[in-house]
Amino acid sequence: MSPAQRTPAAADPLVHLSRAPGLSATGVPRGDSFRAWVQAALAAAKRRRASELSIHVVDLDEGREFNRHYRERDYATNVLSFPAELPPGVRLPLLGDLILCAPVVAREASEQGKRLRDHYAHMTVHGVLHLLGYDHIVDAEAERMEALERKALARLGVADPYA
């Protein structure tokens, strides 16, 4: 089997990273950082299967449009998660898509006194956990999800975002 045909190992998720046209690369982490953050989230959730997802980093206008269209909320938010919807019986490594709004992530990091890179790590881990089916609507679910976030971020040397 050639390298191009090989399925990525669970420890090496396939991450497709894109940035909105015209969005400055300043402050937006590189692809290897996103892969490490995805890998940490998958490890914390004990997902061992191969995984593939897309991450799109957007500006305020695009972030607002996504949130308005899919959540009926007229503002840009930090991260949106779109789990893959596969037909019954189809098993692919595709987890789904994450949308990260760069200006919102940057503003929140500044307001919360966090390093920008650490906040990107947190939002990526948070989004991946949503793709895996975790949520934070009910308190017990939120506690479980936050515990997994802390575990993943600790592996990355990122301080507890909830402390």
Predicted stretch roles:
Residues 1-120, 131-163:
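An acidic/histidine-cluster motif and surrounding catalytic segment
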Residues 123:
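Extended, folded domain segments that form the structural surfaces/walls around functional sites
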